[in-house]
Design a protein with these regions (language model features):
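Asp-box/BNR beta-propeller blade signature and adjacent active/binding-site loops
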Residues: 1-104
C-alpha cells in the first residue's frame, strides 16, 4: 500500500510573508485563527478565540487577500460565551443565497 504524501511549504523563516492579524500580549494569548477565502479571491474572513480556546470569538475581514485586516467586527452577543476554537465556512443554499457559518 502506498502512503499518501501531502506536499507542504514551510514559510516559517520567510518573515516578510508573515501578516499579523491580532497582536496578543504577554498576558493575552491570541491564536488558533481560521480563515475563509471568498470566491472573489481577495475578501477573507478570520475568526479566532480570545485566549486559548475562548472565551469569546473575534471576527475580522480583509479586502486584500489577507495583507491587511479590519478592526474586530460586530458579532452576536452569544459569541461572548464561546469556549472553543471557532471555524468559519461558506455555504450556498438551494435558494442560491450565500451564508457564512461560524462553529465553535
Amino acid at each position: 500500500m502506498n502512503a499518501l504524501r501531502i506536499p507542504t511549504i514551510d514559510v516559517s523563516e520567510e518573515t516578510e510573508r508573515h501578516v499579523m492579524i491580532s497582536q496578543g500580549t504577554s498576558d493575552e494569548y491570541q491564536g488558533h485563527p481560521t480563515t475563509l477565502l471568498m470566491p472573489d479571491i481577495t475578501t477573507m474572513f478570520c475568526v479566532y478565540p480570545l485566549g486559548h480556546g475562548g472565551p469569546a470569538v473575534v471576527l475580522r475581514r480583509s479586502e486584500d487577500a489577507g495583507l491587511t485586516w479590519s478592526a474586530p467586527l460586530p458579532v452576536p452577543d452569544n459569541w461572548a460565551t464561546a469556549n472553543n476554537c471557532p471555524a468559519i465556512f461558506r455555504f450556498v443554499g438551494p435558494d442560491s443565497i450565500e451564508r457564512l457559518f461560524v462553529y465553535e
